[in-house]
């Protein structure tokens, strides 16, 4: 397609060699080489996408403990797919979940992150308000840490990266 649009073969080769992928789609922030903590981010916001992301990270880092911070997006999606989200998230070794990101929706009585988290079967799981996530991360050790969700969890990535690399948030 690029050649038909007028690009030269050299342009295509250069473009492919420097393409880093789509932002927030299995984006590697820290690669975890040499046994260091890996940090990844994915926009996954449906149960199938969450499951696929967790399975992919387990294949990329076999034998390593996968911790996931999943920020639910929308009350209606949480209500409609709570069981499916719990099943998908249960494939991670550890699940951390902040409150639902409401976007355009008003709260629905009885619908919160615990609707999903209560059915997660991972050996380690916890609810953590978004405002407290950086402190939780600072006081924890992670092998592989992945943020998931369509909301604004990715805005914490620069500070999470600094914490993992031995610094602190700005």
Feature-to-residue mapping (PLM):
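ATP-dependent carboxylate-amine ligase
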Residues: 1-170
